[in-house]
Each structure stands twice: as C-alpha cells, then as structure tokens.
Amino acid sequence: MQDSKEILLHLSAFMRTDAPRLTRLNAYYLGKHDILRAPKDPLKPDNRLVNNFCRNITDCTVGYFMGRGIRYSSSDDRTMEMIHRVSTENDERFVNNALARDLSVCGRAAELLWYDDLRHPRFTPLSPDSVIPVYDTGVDPRLKYAIRYYAKADGKTVVEVYDAEDMSVYDYENGTLTHKETTPHFFGDVPVIFYANNRDLQGDFEPVLSLIDAYNRLQSDSVNDFELFADSYLAISGMGAADEEDLARIRRDRVILLDDHGEAKWLTKNVNDVYIENMKSRIAGDIYRFSGTVDMAEETLAGNALSGVAIRYRLLNFENRVSVTEQYFRRSLHARWQMICRLLNLSGASYDGDAIRVIFTRNLPGLPEEAADMAQKLSGILSRRSVIEHLPMVEDADAEMERIREENGEVCEE
C-alpha cells in the first residue's frame, strides 16, 4: 500500500495544474471556447462565433489513425483466437477510438484493466482529467502506481490507487484520505495503462489555441461590423427644426423634404473586406500548418484526381505527426496484451504476449485498390501470410488463410 502523504501531494498538484488544463482542452473540443466568456460591451452588437477547428483537427486525426481499426498477428493460432475473443467481448475498436480521441484532445489517455465475474479480462477507457500516473526516478522511469479519483452521486470523492499488486480505495474529504479497503488484482503490473500522444503530452490542437481564438475574434468582429452597418445612423442637414413627429413621418412616408443646401446620408464604417478575408485565410492556414493537419476542404484534396501516392505526399506532415502517436500507442497496446496474457496464464494457459504483432492501417482513399495491386506484385516474393496480413480489407489473416485452404480443397474435390 502506498504512502498516503505522497498520494495527497500528487493529487493536490494534479488538481491544481493538470486537471484545469485538460478540462479546458476538452471544452474547446466541445465548442466551449474562451470567446463565449469574454466581457460584453453594451454599446456594440455581441455576436460570438465559435469556429471549431479543434473538433475538425481531432476528428480528422482519429479518422485517419483509427478509421480502419487495428489488426493483430501471431504465429500461435490459440493466441489469435484469444485476441479475437477478448477484443470482441470488450468492443476493442470502440475503446481504441475513444483512446485516440483523448490523445488528440488532451495529449494523454488511460485505460483500466479488470476482470468480470467469469474472470474474463476487460479494459475500459478512463477520463484523462481524473487519472494520475506516478513514476519512479530511474533513468528509464517505470510506472510505480496510478491514482484515479471521481465524485459519487452523494458528492463524496473516492480515490483508487493501483500498484503492481493491489487496488486500494480511499475516501477523500477536506484534504485527507481515509483508507477503506485493499484487494489484489492479479495482473502482475499496474493495471492502468497510459497512452501518450507525443513526448510532451500535448494535444493536437493545443499549440494553435491562440490562433483559433484570434480567428474566433476576427469572425465575430466581422459579423458585428455588418450588424452595425445594418443599424447605421441617418444624418440629415438642411431640414430645419425637425421633431419626433417629423422623423416618424419620414419613416412612414419614406420622403425627406430638405432645403436648397440640405443633405441626407448614412454614417457608415468603411470595412476592408479584402483585408479581413486575407487575414482569415492566413490564420486558418497557420492553424492547419502549425497543428500538422491538412485542410481536407482544399481544392487539391476535395476531388478524386489525385493518386494514392500524391495524396500521401500532401499528407506527409500529417503522417509524420500521426506516426509519433502510433509509436506510443503500440507500446501501450503491448502492455495491455502482456497483462491480459499474464492474467489468463494463471488459469493454466500459455499465451505469449511478446509474440503478438500490432498492425496499423491508415484510412486513405484508394488504399484497398493499391494494396491489392501491391499484393499481386509481391505474390511469389513474400509468403502468402505476409501478403494477406498487409491487405487492409482483411481483418483476420488466419481466418482468411483457412478460407483459402477450404476453397482450394473444394476445387480439388470437384
């Protein structure tokens, strides 16, 4: 069981610094931007437009990274059967998408491994703003334990601490912890797995929040100026002493009677539309450029004229950023399956987590056709299994190999 004072220090520091930042990032993804909380000027129109680049950046990244799902490969048929069973029971594709979404928004994600009454391994994503990793101080820091806190329906806060052997539950009130219970979990390691988006644990749109705020202000000011233009003042000179009745008659009859040197004109603000549109285009371009994301609405990407190679070239910076996320995601998936294998092996199984290979496939248009063409060219050079594993339309290489053998057997019988 971990030291209560140390747990409180980590809990207090996280609530003071990390939790507000992560909450703000999630709010931006949901469209709750700072411009909505800006002070109001009672003398001006108050349009506050949210241009949600954050959701666009995250949804494009998650779709590109996880749109075709994750596949696994192993030379052991029993291990592949176990992976298929556990993945199906846990709706793994949904979990992986949720983790990728948290990575893109918050720069970090977490999942909890547990087992149900039938001792079937389960994994569930946790909210990043309520989970605290605690590492040792070695050259290669290892996870000592993880803290999870949440509020119950009665308003009380519960703190759960997971280490390599046990889970301890505490009540948290007025800055103090009261220990309730400790139970073993049998995973052989800390059953909370952390996922990193990059080395700095930064979200995908976090570096461009100031640009997004600037675009929101510019767009809102443009609409406010247009509204001011619609409500502009009418200046009348040479009409003599006009009273409210005269002004009412002008509005009703739409006729103004002026002296010889009289004049009527609107007082309007000159708006440089070209400058504003150029500024908006520049800021929008900087948002996509500095976030390492491609604007999918660009004319060069909107059509179907580009080949797969040309599209990949246009997506190079985007791919570089996603590749970093993939490296960290792969390590965390390896930890997930290692612990699942360790738990199942306690019941007499002999699964090898190191023998599980993770295969990521980008969600690109035209990819299946190009992959099929490449598979045909590699036929006879690589083994049939290796070729099949890299076809994005095949989720289970073993099942596909079995179907091929069955079809070949039927042909021979005929």
Annotate the PLM regions.
Residues 75, 79, 87, 91, ...:
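Short amphipathic alpha-helical segments
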Residues 1-122:
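Extended, helix-rich architectural segments
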Residues 180-310:
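Extended, charged amphipathic alpha-helical segments
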Residues 2-18, 237-238, 403-414:
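Leucine-centric amphipathic alpha-helical interface motifs
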Residues 282-414:
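C-terminal helix-loop subdomains that flank or include functional centers
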Residues 80-83, 264-265, 313-315:
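A short, surface-exposed helix-loop junction/capping segment
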Residues 18, 32, 64, 68, ...:
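Short secondary-structure junctions and interdomain/linker hinges
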